[in-house]
């Protein structure tokens, strides 16, 4: 016990040091120490900040080679310099070391933002929220304070922002009409809404509204939880229609006044251009930085207001609570361009709900248990595993291993395997790459021996 107390004290001091390093990375060095940011920090000091950032964002174990770590460190240093130079200008918004601080802007855009998608067919533009002379709207509104906005969520590395934007708007109108804030399932949209939308490869909110209407409702996040990967549609959960909507409409385009009128009545799905470096590293304040109108990210407008004479929108993102203002962004409102900041007024849309949800049918039956994955007549792996041959001769496999992922890549070393999102095996580094020569990698998984079933193998074959 005598050894335990000093150890705990050392750990506590280390944690304080880490916390201080992270805080220092967000406040300019000039403010804290009175020296120039450019060249003001030593290499060791920046490395300390970087190591603390890795721990904070759970990336400490994600770099599997010194070359990769050195490359990420150089990118981090450049982003840190960009953050400090911006914050020294005392503008309306501040930057910080977000979860994207070790990515170049090209990497950030290619991994976390979807390609621009054009809606097929005409928009359902309605005059319901068209701005008119004489409209009396509140000076500010925040649907979070009215209980119509669920907790900030995190889409992860899946390009499913469209699903989070859709669900956020549906959760909002459902609470406004029924009084119940029910957290709904983005994963159901990712898995099941595949007629036009493409799961982790992008989609549009209007198509997702159409899916919910045609399906007769959508399930809860609790019963159909988010996984962050494309999956097979669970038909039983798809038929659990907990929350319904009756229709959807589009806000008149290129009109921030019409968008204001819409947001005064309910949370609104919006699309914006989020690919700029300042957006990548946004920390707080009213964002009025450089951005265009190449819409590549779906979010939710949940309010608006004014601070020190500057109008803003309140926007809920889907990158977790560590990004921005606890997961939110304030964007400049009433700018000179009719498209709004970052194109916010180009494609806003919203669900319509006229009445209560269907009666609660009680607990739904669990989804059927999937059978084991069958490797051949003599070996099986657990459900949702991939069979990988351990020993083969000619065309025959004499021993099987199990990779604990669906649709995995079996590496040629007969020992490891890779997720289907990172299908390229790097046997030298023991990692899986997003593509050949890609900077993005994860650690390769080990196979486990398959289960033999000598006596009943043939009996179980369908």
From Swiss-Prot:
The active site is at 161, 297, 317. Glycans are attached at residues 90, 414. Inhibited by the cysteine protease inhibitor E64 (L-trans-epoxysuccinyl-leucylamide-(4-guanido)-butane). Its EC number is 3.4.22.-. Keywords: Cytoplasm, Disulfide bond, Glycoprotein, Golgi apparatus, Hydrolase, Protease, Signal, Thiol protease, Vacuole. Residues 22-136, 353-462 form a propeptide. Induction: By high salt conditions and drought stress. Coiled coil: none annotated. One of its GO terms (cellular component) is P-body. The keyword Mitochondrion does not apply. It is found in: Vacuole; Golgi apparatus; Cytoplasm, Stress granule; Cytoplasm, P-body. SMART domains: GRAN, Inhibitor_I29, Pept_C1. Disulfide bonds join 158-200, 192-233, 291-342, 375-387, 381-402. Cysteine protease that plays a role in immunity, senescence, and biotic and abiotic stresses. Involved in immunity against the necrotrophic fungal pathogen Botrytis cinerea. Involved in elicitor-stimulated programmed cell death (PCD). During infection by the necrotrophic fungal pathogen Botrytis cinerea, functions as a PCD-promoting protease that is released from the ER body or vacuole to the cytoplasm. Accumulates in endoplasmic reticulum-derived bodies in epidermal cells and may participate in cell death in stressed or injured cells. This is Cysteine proteinase RD21A. The gene is RD21A.
């Amino acid at each position: 016990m005598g050894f335990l107390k000093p150890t705990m004290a050392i750990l506590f001091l280390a944690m304080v040091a880490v916390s201080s390093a992270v805080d220092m990375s967000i406040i300019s060095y000039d403010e804290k120490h009175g020296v120039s940011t450019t060249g003001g920090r030593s290499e060791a000091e920046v490395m300390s900040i970087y190591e603390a950032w890795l721990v904070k964002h759970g990336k400490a174990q994600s770099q599997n080679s010194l070359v990769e770590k050195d490359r990420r460190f150089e990118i981090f240093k450049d982003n840190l310099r960009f953050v400090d130079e911006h914050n020294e200008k005392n503008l309306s918004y501040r930057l910080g070391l977000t979860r994207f601080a070790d990515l170049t802007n090209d990497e950030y855009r290619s991994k976390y933002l979807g390609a621009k998608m054009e809606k097929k067919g005409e928009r359902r533009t309605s005059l319901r929220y068209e701005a008119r002379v004489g409209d009396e709207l509140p000076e500010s509104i925040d649907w979070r304070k009215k209980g119509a906005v669920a907790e900030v969520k995190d889409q992860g590395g899946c390009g499913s922002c469209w699903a989070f934007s859709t669900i956020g708007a549906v959760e909002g109108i459902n609470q406004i009409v029924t009084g119940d804030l029910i957290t709904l399932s983005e994963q159901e949209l990712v898995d099941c809404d595949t007629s036009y939308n493409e799961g982790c490869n992008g989609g549009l909110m209007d198509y997702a509204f159409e899916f919910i209407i045609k399906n007769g409702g959508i399930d809860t996040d609790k019963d159909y939880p988010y996984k962050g990967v494309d999956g097979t549609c669970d038909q039983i959960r798809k038929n659990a229609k907990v929350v319904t909507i009756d229709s959807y409409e589009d806000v008149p385009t290129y009109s921030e006044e019409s968008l204001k009128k819409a947001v005064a009545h309910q949370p609104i799905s919006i699309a914006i251009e989020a690919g700029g470096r300042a957006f990548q590293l946004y920390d707080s304040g009213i964002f009025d930085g450089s951005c265009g109108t190449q819409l590549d990210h779906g979010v939710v407008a949940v309010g608006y207001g004014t601070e020190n004479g500057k109008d803003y929108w309140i926007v809920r993102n889907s990158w977790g609570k560590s990004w921005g203002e606890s997961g939110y962004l304030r964007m400049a409102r009433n700018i000179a361009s009719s498209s709004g900041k970052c194109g916010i007024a180009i494609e806003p849309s919203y669900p319509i709900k006229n009445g209560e949800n269907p009666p609660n049918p009680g607990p739904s039956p669990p989804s059927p248990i999937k059978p084991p994955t069958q490797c051949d007549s003599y070996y099986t792996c657990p459900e949702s595993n991939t069979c990988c041959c351990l020993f083969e001769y000619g065309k025959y496999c004499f021993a099987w291993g199990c990779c604990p992922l669906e649709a995995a890549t079996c590496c040629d070393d007969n020992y490891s395997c890779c997720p289907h999102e990172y299908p390229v095996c790097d046997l030298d580094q023991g990692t899986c790459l997003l593509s050949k020569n890609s900077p993005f990698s994860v650690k390769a998984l080990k196979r486990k021996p398959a289960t033999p079933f000598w006596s009943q193998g043939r009996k179980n074959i369908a």
